[in-house]
């Protein structure tokens, strides 16, 4: 997806017109952000998704290649590439509206085939930016290969019991967790400037003490970096993810704000 971001001191009320301070375009989308962060963190990363045959789609393809994300399984659709309209307030908090576009055109059989083909598959991450049935099919195929599945339930929608059952990890933020209700799952709760908490074990890692200027994509940076270190243990992965997310909020944008591996390692 493409991020279309407006920075403004205060979000206007209904019917009010306000003057913003800055407008930017950048590469985004939750799955794309997570893939890019995982690649930055050193993981061999493949992206399964769909873009439009348009300028945004071409830019996304090139960005993945520049970032070291394998695009063999990136499909192309007649529908426009998905976009996210983002408003960022002076305190760094954001509001986001996504228009999925080509995201809704991912072919299920092609996605499952990709899961079967990817060599040395360890982890598959899914979100709710695509049809839930596609994510479920991919998770079933992943678990059949012995891979770990991670679900980031955003943008939030009610999850099927079957998808929950096929998710080894569910990583919601506070509002998504509240909407999930009482479910039987392995949950890692991201709590913004408070850090992250593994509800099942009680383990908690505090967030870095920083001044946030833009929280866009911070949760995605946590998910991608956490996944990249999960084979080293949950404690290591949680700490690494918190550092990546903490550094990202000190810069504007989503992927453009992501720290290098060396920057994260300085704190870990």
Region locations from a protein language model:
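Beta-strand->loop->alpha-helix junctions that form or flank phosphate-binding loops
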Residues: 22, 48-53, 72-81, 154, ...
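Aromatic/hydrophobic pocket-lining residues that form π-stacking "cages" and hydrophobic walls in ligand
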Residues: 34, 60, 137-140, 244
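Ribokinase/PfkB-type carbohydrate-kinase core domain
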Residues: 62-76, 86-204
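Glycine-rich phosphate/adenosyl-contacting loop at the front of the ribokinase-like
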Residues: 1-50, 55-59, 212-213, 252
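Short, conserved phosphate/pyrophosphate- and ester-handling motifs at nucleotide-, phospho-/glycolipid
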Residues: 38, 173, 219
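Conserved phosphate-binding/catalytic region of the ribokinase-like
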Residues: 180-268
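Gly/Ala-rich phosphate-binding loop of Rossmann-like dinucleotide-binding domains
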Residues: 39-40, 143, 231
């Amino acid at each position: 997806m493409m991020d279309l971001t407006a920075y403004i001191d205060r979000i206007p009320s209904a019917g009010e017109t306000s003057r913003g301070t800055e407008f930017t375009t950048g590469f985004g989308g939750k799955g794309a952000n997570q893939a890019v962060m995982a690649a930055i963190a050193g993981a061999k990363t493949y992206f399964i998704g769909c873009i439009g045959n348009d300028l945004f789609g071409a830019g996304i393809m090139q960005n993945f290649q520049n970032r070291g994300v394998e695009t063999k399984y990136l499909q192309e659709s007649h529908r426009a590439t998905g976009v996210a309209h983002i408003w960022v307030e002076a305190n760094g908090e954001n509001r986001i509206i996504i228009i999925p576009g080509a995201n809704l055109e991912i072919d299920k059989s092609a996605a499952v085939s990709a899961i079967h083909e990817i060599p040395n598959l360890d982890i598959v991450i899914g979100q709710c930016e695509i049809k839930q049935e596609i994510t479920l099919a991919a998770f079933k195929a992943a678990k059949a290969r012995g891979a770990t599945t991670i679900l980031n339930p955003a943008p939030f929608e009610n999850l099927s019991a079957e998808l929950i059952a096929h998710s080894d990890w569910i990583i919601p933020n506070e509002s998504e967790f509240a909407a999930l209700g009482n479910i039987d799952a392995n949950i890692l709760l991201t709590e913004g400037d408070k850090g992250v908490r593994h509800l099942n074990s009680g383990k908690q890692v505090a967030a870095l003490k920083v001044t946030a200027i833009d929280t866009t994509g911070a949760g995605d940076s946590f998910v991608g970096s956490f996944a990249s270190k999960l084979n080293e243990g949950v404690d290591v992965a949680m700490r690494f993810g918190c550092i990546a997310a903490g550094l990202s909020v000190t810069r504007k944008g989503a992927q453009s704000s992501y720290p290098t591996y060396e920057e994260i390692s300085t704190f870990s």
